[in-house]
């Protein structure tokens, strides 16, 4: 009977380990998705919470407050952005550490142009307190280009095919907070701050 119990216990332990790995993969994949949405919503607070609290920002210092300064500067270079996660790979170092790549298409509105970039984010992840975080993100691009015909200009309307004005990115409560007091900068970046 002991042998059968040991075998059953071994199966349960292996099943638990597999389930743990699947849950970790899903949590790490959600990091990339949450990053894209937070960036597009200008939700800087939630963007920062995706990183370890002692994130190394290189020559600028350590910590989320240092990272905040960087993201606020970067995100004020564009008005609307759309980040699309198109693929994700994950390699586990051990149960609490992993590396990965996130393939991402990023679109940025800059004044009268829309810039599109095909990126690969090289990530390092760590689990702390049962939750996965970014330790590091290093973006690299295959290309960055201007759309041939930007989705605005003299013949463009902000109304969609159904006649409704798009609600994004203004639907995100953090969007208004981010741009509050910066209407002049927004006007430099877009003709249609819907």
Write out the residue ranges for each language-model feature.
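Conserved aromatic-histidine-acidic binding/catalytic patches
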Residues: 20-23, 78, 113
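Short beta-strand edge/turn micro-motifs at domain boundaries
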Residues: 2-3, 97-99, 120-155, 161-166
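Short, low-complexity N-terminal intrinsically disordered segments enriched in polar/charged residues
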Residues: 1-37, 41, 49-50
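A hydrophobic membrane-anchoring alpha-helix module
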Residues: 153-194
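A solvent-exposed, acidic/Ser-Thr-rich amphipathic alpha-helical stretch
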Residues: 43-110
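A structural preference for long, well-packed, hydrophobic secondary-structure segments
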Residues: 25, 104-105, 114
